[in-house]
């Protein structure tokens, strides 16, 4: 968020089953935040849908925003199956999850425009082959942009921010 705050007015719809912990982490970082809890007393929804997002959009001053990021409830199954009105879909896929996830959960991987292959800083300790992760993603989505990143160290994040910049500029035309 800090990287983009000076360039674009950003809004975030933060989807979680319960709590405002993630939204609180983003508070004060230059973005408008709209919290969307799906909890219903029985565990909550495992995804967001368009009506939920529409309600959350009411909490943002859209006329003043260049980009709205929707963080869906986090798993690799449900979110891919529900249209939330997005113009592009990104996902975070961590090297700690194993390279088999694109084959086990192909719907999500087929649906995305960009894959952030996160926790790349752990590769030396996990003894994993990044090329294998990329190849598995390519099996189910040959056109997705794949960006190896480390949110912790910042490695590769410039590429992600460049992707977002190109998206925002391209969407404005």
Regions found by a protein language model. Give the residues of each.
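Nucleotide-state-sensitive switch-loop elements of NTP-binding domains
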Residues: 1-87, 98-100, 109
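Conserved Rossmann-like nucleotide-binding pocket used by diverse enzymes
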Residues: 13, 116, 147
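Residue-level signature of catalytic and energy-coupling elements of molecular machines
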Residues: 16, 71, 118, 133, ...
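Short acidic active-site motifs
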Residues: 22, 104, 156
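Structural signal for conserved beta-strand scaffold positions within catalytic alpha/beta enzyme cores
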Residues: 35-37, 91, 148
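Conserved C-terminal guanine-recognition region of P-loop GTPase G domains, centered on the G4
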Residues: 76-88, 92-144
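Canonical P-loop GTPase G-domain recognition
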Residues: 122-173
């Amino acid at each position: 968020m800090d990287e983009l705050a000076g360039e674009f007015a950003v809004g975030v719809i933060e989807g979680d089953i319960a709590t405002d912990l993630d939204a609180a982490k983003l508070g004060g970082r230059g973005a408008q935040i709209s919290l969307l809890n799906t909890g219903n007393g029985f565990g909550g929804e495992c995804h967001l849908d368009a009506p939920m997002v529409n309600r959350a959009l009411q909490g943002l001053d859209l006329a003043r925003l260049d980009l709205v990021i929707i963080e869906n409830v986090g798993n690799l199954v449900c979110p891919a199956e529900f249209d939330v009105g997005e113009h592009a879909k990104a996902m975070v896929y961590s090297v700690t999850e194993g390279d088999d996830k694109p084959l086990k959960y192909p719907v999500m991987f087929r649906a995305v425009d960009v894959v952030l292959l996160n926790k790349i800083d752990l590769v030396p300790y996990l003894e994993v082959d990044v090329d294998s992760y990329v190849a598995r993603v390519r099996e189910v989505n040959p056109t997705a942009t794949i960006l190896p990143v480390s949110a912790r160290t910042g490695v590769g994040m410039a590429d992600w921010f460049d992707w977002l910049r190109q998206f925002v500029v391209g969407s404005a035309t």
